[in-house]
Amino acid sequence: MIYQRFNPEGWEENFTPMSKDYLNKAMEAGTIMQGVVRKCDSNYNLHIDFGNNITGIIPREEVEAINVDETGFPKPNICMSKVNQYVQFKVKDVDERDKYILSRKDVGKEALKWVKNELEKGQIVKGIVKSIRPYGVFVEIGGGIVGLLHIEDISVARIKSPQERLKIGQKANFMVKSIDRGNNRILLTYKELLGTWEENAKNFEEGSTVKGIVRETEKAKNGIFIELTPNLVGLAEYKEGIEYGQNVNVYIKKIIPEKKKVKLVIV
């Protein structure tokens, strides 16, 4: 079951021009809204175009709830990275020029309360991949809140780079692995949602030949690990000339459910 109080920014990609009446009602109700940042100015304020010649501004101090310095301001690169991206915000005020003053920080504060009070280990959340590092993936799960997905939690089959499975902007479901509420740190896992060993193994039968991907070549252990699915790996005898990432055909020699093992032969 997906548990979500806040959609990730940009989960729903759409734009509908907004009227002043609509924005004023949203301001009164404290509604969380979404728009695309059209510009980051020289003071690192973010500008939103609502259509109908109506604009809004997210002042720099209202951009972030977490990633700020000792003065309460986010770093310039954080502000600049929001250009042409969907962001969530609340309408705080309207100035004498009819420009709406917005706050992304207020949404972030609400999302932090959700994380601290309601989000639990094992819950499934929607997320969007925001950045990829060699060690893992940063995923936004709602209201600007970001969790870390370590590379070893992406799949059972070992991979050398997260980009072999996920890409920036990809939308998917993730499971909460752990929460450090004191430091606002969330660890996610993806492999638990790719099926158990039994669920994956039932799609294969002894005596059949299928395609696999080489994931580990360990000559010392006299074996090559072959990915049949992201969450199902079999072991084949070592063979010269086989390299990581290579597509190979494998004969399924034996499936051993009680040991959760699959014996393969590279053909």
Regions found by a protein language model. Give the residues of each.
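Single-stranded RNA-binding regions, centering on S1/OB-family and related RNA-binding modules
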Residues: M1-V267
